[in-house]
Amino acid sequence: REISTIMGIEQYCLFRLGDAGFPAQQLQFSCNEIKFPNADNSKLLQEGEWYHVAVTFDTEKKVAVMYVDGREQSRIEDYGKGEPINLGMQNRGKDFMFKIGHSYGEPTDFSRQLDGEICEVRVWNVVRTQQEIFDNMYNVDPTTSGLCAYWKFNEGHDDIAEDYTGHGNDAHAHTSPAIWPEGIEVTQKNKE
């Protein structure tokens, strides 16, 4: 599989692993069809390991930064068009909605589905600092200013992933029944 999507909107703003001609185990951010970083085998994620991954995009300063386990991995300046990103836009059709673990096509099309597991996803409308990302890799107060959505994926029932911020951005699983993880132990790398 060439692309393994973490989250985003196809052809608009995606955080993913791999791409055509790009290493399958390297993180890539693609916004308005501008992709970063360049292919680099020194940045590959190892199969079978848990990672905390994050990307920040300051649209005003046109700077995007990618973090792995709370540490800066890649940075690009003069990135993007300087326009805000709207992950809530739904006027492009169902194939182009914000998705987690999948980016395009029908739920039964596994060609761009994440080949892995996700413990939590957070979406912010502020640029988090490296220190904030590192300190809050494993937990954050759901009422923190700028936190728009926070899915823990630990509900264990139905097909709804609750948004813990209280903003009502509940996510719906496209597999039925949803598979909820149990007993996952994730090493807290910021506490080692």
Positions of predicted regions on the chain:
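Extracellular glycan-associated modules
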Residues: 1-169, 175-192
